[in-house]
């Protein structure tokens, strides 16, 4: 029986993780989890799984629900996430919280020797060199949960590294893949949140609509697998059935395909290095009638090019890209800027903020905060057309 901690259990990845835990009750035991503010979800899961500790991170809710419920201890605030992952009973940590708040508990889990099922891409994008040094130092196992990276993880394990010429991340194309370019300036938040394939949170759905999510995943793939940016490609695949592709030196391509359901990569990350037992959800290839692949339109998706630019620059540039995007997407979701202003703000940040090569966590965090301040200042001063 493996103890599991899930950071961000009420989100889409967390919800899918619970499905896997229910399917394999003899293999996994939910020992701790966090929610931001959804007490109803937390209460129901405490009643179902009886974890040792839970955490509510919303600062407005500190103390509201007491210090325990049934036999489960209740903690509050982002700092308490570290307590969840350090429990002796926890063997694997699923990091599914959004944004930079995932980095400190991830570092704590690495230093505690826990297996990491990482779904918080911002941790690797912003702090990639630091995280990789810690993983090597503590001999930690880190398995990606994102469907594309998990697919590549499995494909790369089956092939000799010297035989792999390139890796490819697939993308659905998001909510606006077929929308006329001139209409992008005027799309609404509601339109952006209407993803054709996946059910995800608002921020990641907006990222997907502009392929910025895929840009973040390109940077993440670089740090996870060690491929150069020239060896990492992106293709539009509207069916979302093929999740990852590797091209071998003999000219062949190996594809990982599955029904678009997050339970597959989550189950793999929990069971790894052991094989995943037969899942209750099955899909037959005979139901996959069409596979389409085509290159992304960089006029439609300028954020993807900016991600490659930031990744190749290295240092704090990927973190600048990520922080600028987080702030810009928040402004869009509040209907304060247009959809096409998001990449313009990111480009402005990359051009105006000095890139550095931090050696410490604080160095990365300082540049992250500088970027967020810059975006807010640009918006408040009207520095970028909205």
Swiss-Prot record:
Signal peptide: none
EC number: 1.1.1.267
Keywords: Isoprene biosynthesis, Manganese, Metal-binding, NADP, Oxidoreductase
Record GO biological process: isopentenyl diphosphate biosynthetic process, methylerythritol 4-phosphate pathway involved in terpenoid biosynthetic process
Residues that bind 1-deoxy-D-xylulose 5-phosphate: 121, 147-148, 172, 195, 208, 213-214, 217
Keyword Manganese in record: yes
Residue sites binding Mn(2+) per the record: 146, 148, 217
Role of this protein: Catalyzes the NADPH-dependent rearrangement and reduction of 1-deoxy-D-xylulose-5-phosphate (DXP) to 2-C-methyl-D-erythritol 4-phosphate (MEP).
Protein name: 1-deoxy-D-xylulose 5-phosphate reductoisomerase
Organism: Leptospira biflexa serovar Patoc (strain Patoc 1 / ATCC 23582 / Paris)
Lineage: Bacteria, Pseudomonadati, Spirochaetota, Spirochaetia, Leptospirales
Gene assigned in the entry: dxr
């Amino acid at each position: 029986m493996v103890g599991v901690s899930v950071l961000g259990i009420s989100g889409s990845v967390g919800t899918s993780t619970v499905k896997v835990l229910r399917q394999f009750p003899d293999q996994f035991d939910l020992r701790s989890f966090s929610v931001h503010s959804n007490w109803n979800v937390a209460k129901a899961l405490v009643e179902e799984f009886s974890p040792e500790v839970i955490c509510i991170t919303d600062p407005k809710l500190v103390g509201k629900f007491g210090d325990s419920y049934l036999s489960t201890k209740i903690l509050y605030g982002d700092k308490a996430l570290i307590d969840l992952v350090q429990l002796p009973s926890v063997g694997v940590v699923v990091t599914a919280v959004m944004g930079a708040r995932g980095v400190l508990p991830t570092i704590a889990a690495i230093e505690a020797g826990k297996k990491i099922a990482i779904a918080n891409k911002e941790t690797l994008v912003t702090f990639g060199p630091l995280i990789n040094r810690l993983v090597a130092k503590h001999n930690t196992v880190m398995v990606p949960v994102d469907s594309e990276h998990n697919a590549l993880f499995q494909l790369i394990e089956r092939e000799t590294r010297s035989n792999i010429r390139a890796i490819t991340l697939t993308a659905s194309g998001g909510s606006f893949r077929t929308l006329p370019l001139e209409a992008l300036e005027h799309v609404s938040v509601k339109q952006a949140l209407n993803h054709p394939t996946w059910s995800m949170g608002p921020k990641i759905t907006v990222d997907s609509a502009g392929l910025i999510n895929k840009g973040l995943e390109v940077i993440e793939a670089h740090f996870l697998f060690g491929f150069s940016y020239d060896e990492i490609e992106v293709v539009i695949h509207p069916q979302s059935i093929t999740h990852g592709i590797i091209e071998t030196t003999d000219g062949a391509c190996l594809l990982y395909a599955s029904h678009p359901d997050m339970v597959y990569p989550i189950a793999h990350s929990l069971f790894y290095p052991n094989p995943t037992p037969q899942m209750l959800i099955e899909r037959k290839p005979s139901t996959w009638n069409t596979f389409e692949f085509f290159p992304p339109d960089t006029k439609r998706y300028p954020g993807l090019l900016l991600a490659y630019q930031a990744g190749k620059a290295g240092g704090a540039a990927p973190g600048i890209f990520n922080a600028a995007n987080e702030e810009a997407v928040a402004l869009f979701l509040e209907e304060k800027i247009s959809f096409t202003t998001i990449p313009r703000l990111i480009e402005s940040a990359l051009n105006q903020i000095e890139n550095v090569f931090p050696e410490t966590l604080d160095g990365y965090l300082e540049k992250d905060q500088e970027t967020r301040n810059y975006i807010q200042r640009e918006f408040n001063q009207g520095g970028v057309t909205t």
